Amino acid sequence: MAKKIKQIAIYGKGGIGKSTTTSNISAALSIAGYKVMQFGCDPKSDSTNTLRGGEYIPTVLDTLRDSHSVKAQDVIFEGFNGIYCVEAGGPAPGVGCAGRGIITSVSLLKQQRVFEELDLDFVIYDVLGDVVCGGFAVPVREGIAEHVYTVTSADFMAIYAANNLFKGIQKYSREGGALLGGVIANSINAPYAKEIVDDFVKRTDTQVVEYVPRSVTVTQSELQGKTTIEAAPQSEQAKVYQRLAQRIAEHTESKVPAPLDTHELRQWAADWGKQLVALESGLIAPAAAGNL
């Protein structure tokens, strides 16, 4: 009987730390003995940089444009600790759909049965989450990914993007699409950031998988073109990523989230804005945050 490959999609708005988080998860899983492929699904094509010493790799779409026929070995590159790295790429500037690279790349690798031939344990898709449409929705819509995670902070636009993803998961769940594994709360250092994220996941019937603090260790590692797992394996930040990777590896039950509608989300955000003003001015006690 063929081994079941665990396919995971990690979404998040641009700049939220999605690729940093994904690469450290991949690195931690590989250190734990799993065979991993990281599949970059962002037109910037930089998902796998820190797995390859800061180097960019040729993308699937660029390779197709140059040769019109592509073999898997032309677009799969080995990174840190044997992690297989793929970048879908995007169209030429001003031309076509940015999500098209995902559709083309996934089809190419599936046709050539690459996942089975490499005997992978995990395929992790790193997907731009500002919009959940067209090609960017493929891992969710087609059920390619079994479990979906979203990286968010307490910033409104990050939460807005997460809520939009929840809407997409809810819609496609009726057609066999992927379900939500949980929320990865990133950069949780600011006052009340944890409380804001906790309140959001409670209201959307989801869960936080891990709280990832902002850390200078991550910055130092990325300046070297490395993940924290590679550059600072004994650091406290590395332990956070290792714990997150273990939870993802052990996770089996995903669910359909309950997204807020646009009015509910705006009202929720406005209520939190008022609470933060009251907290800062001492009108309410910190323990009351999120309970008003």
What are these regions (language model features)?
Residues 3-43:
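Walker A/P-loop phosphate-binding motif and the immediately C-terminal alpha-helix
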Residues 7, 38, 83-85, 208-211:
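Conserved beta-strand scaffold positions in the cores of enzyme catalytic domains, especially
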Residues 14, 86, 105, 126, ...:
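Residue-level signature of catalytic and energy-coupling elements of molecular machines
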Residues 28-88:
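N-terminal phosphate/diphosphate-binding loop that engages ATP/GTP or pyrophosphate donors
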Residues 43-45, 90, 129, 189:
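Short, glycine/acidic-enriched loop or turn micro-motifs at the edges of active sites
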Residues 90-100, 156-157:
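Flexible beta-alpha connector loops of hexameric P-loop NTPases
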Residues 111, 115-122, 127-214, 219-220:
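Conserved catalytic-core segment of NTP-binding enzymes
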Residues 171-292:
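C-terminal lobe/tail of nucleotide-utilizing enzymes
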